[in-house]
């Protein structure tokens, strides 16, 4: 049995390390992450994590873990910005408001699937144009849903969260441990 992480995210690798787990392989899946017309953020996030875990090649006894993190402002999905201009628009829209960060986790072993999603609330302080410009020059917005990472420089913009910090970063640790135990990961033998 091999444990495969279906993600290229260094943050997810770090979070798994907090559980004492190192993947035997890292295989980021290639899927189309375009939201369907009218698709709601939570349904979108769950669909993407399922599609990711289905797209990873694995043996019948291997355990595959995939996740998707989505930033939602109301019904609007804020994905990974294409460029600095879009990142600035995202940050302006989040400024002074609460939004949701949804992380869906899917674990597959053979034909079985275990999944869970975690919804956290995040408040972003009012941002000045100077703060937005300075943040954009760091490049930290690149490849990040909603144009920010709470564990990076943008953490200074977040005075309040409700929910799971690790889920906001990209992998809810408590829920992930439960899913891996259900799938029979050796790290959790005897824990169920």
Curated annotation (Swiss-Prot):
Keyword line: Cytoplasm, Hydrolase, Nucleotide metabolism, Plasmid
Domain of life: Bacteria
Protein's GO biological process: nucleotide metabolic process
Family: Belongs to the Maf family. YhdE subfamily.
Species, as recorded: Ruegeria pomeroyi (strain ATCC 700808 / DSM 15171 / DSS-3)
Gene3D superfamilies: 3.90.950.10
Matches recorded under InterPro entries: ITPase-like_fam, Maf-like
Function field: Nucleoside triphosphate pyrophosphatase that hydrolyzes dTTP and UTP. May have a dual role in cell division arrest and in preventing the incorporation of modified nucleotides into cellular nucleic acids.
Molecular function per GO: dTTP diphosphatase activity; UTP diphosphatase activity
Compartments where found: Cytoplasm
Cofactor(s) of this protein: a divalent metal cation
Protein name as it appears in the record: dTTP/UTP pyrophosphatase
GO cellular component, one term: cytoplasm
Annotated catalytic residues: 68 (proton acceptor)
CDD domains: Maf (cd00555)
Signal peptide: none
EC numbers, comma separated: 3.6.1.9
Catalytic activity entry: dTTP + H2O = dTMP + diphosphate + H(+); UTP + H2O = UMP + diphosphate + H(+)
Site entry (Important for substrate specificity), positions: 11, 69, 151
């Amino acid at each position: 049995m091999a444990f495969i992480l279906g993600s290229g995210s260094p943050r997810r690798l770090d979070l798994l390390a907090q559980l004492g787990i190192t993947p035997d392989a890292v295989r980021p899946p290639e899927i189309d992450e375009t939201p369907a017309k009218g698709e709601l953020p939570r349904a979108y996030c769950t669909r993407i994590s399922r599609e990711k875990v289905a797209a990873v090649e694995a043996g019948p006894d291997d355990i595959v873990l995939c996740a998707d993190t989505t930033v939602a402002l109301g019904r609007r999905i804020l994905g990974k910005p294409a460029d600095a201009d879009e990142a600035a628009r995202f940050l302006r829209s989040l400024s002074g408001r609460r939004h949701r960060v949804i992380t869906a986790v899917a674990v597959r072993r053979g034909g079985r699937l275990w999944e869970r999603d975690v919804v956290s609330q995040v408040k972003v302080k009012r941002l000045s144009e100077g703060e937005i410009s300075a943040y954009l020059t760091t490049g930290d917005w690149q490849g990040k849903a909603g144009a920010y990472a709470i564990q990076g420089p943008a953490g200074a913009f977040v005075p309040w969260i409700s929910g799971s910090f690790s889920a906001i970063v990209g992998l809810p640790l408590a829920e992930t441990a439960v899913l891996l135990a259900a799938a029979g990961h050796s790290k959790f033998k005897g824990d169920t």
